[in-house]
């Protein structure tokens, strides 16, 4: 549940960055389009968020505490970038 919480948080960050989420968008499309809004330095965080979300949602593998900590850290990185962008406007 924690991973899905952080994924929803990530989606809210994307909305703040101006990404018009569509109900038909899957995680691959969201990641691809988010790369147009975030700096290249954040691409690894975007990929990590998707990878951990897929593991939690579709995989037989258990989500570890490390996975939760990583997606939280990635969301923090993306949120900080979003905050910086908002301050510039």
Named regions from a protein language model:
Residues 1-89:
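Membrane-proximal, non-transmembrane interaction modules
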């Amino acid at each position: 549940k924690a991973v899905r919480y952080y994924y929803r948080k990530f989606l809210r960050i994307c909305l703040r960055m101006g990404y018009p989420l569509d109900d038909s968008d899957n995680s691959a499309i969201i990641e691809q389009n988010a790369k147009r809004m975030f700096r290249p330095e954040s691409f690894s965080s975007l990929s990590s968020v998707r990878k951990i979300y897929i593991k939690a949602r579709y995989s037989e593998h258990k989500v570890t505490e490390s996975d939760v900590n990583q997606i939280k850290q990635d969301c923090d990185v993306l949120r900080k970038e979003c905050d910086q962008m908002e301050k510039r406007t």
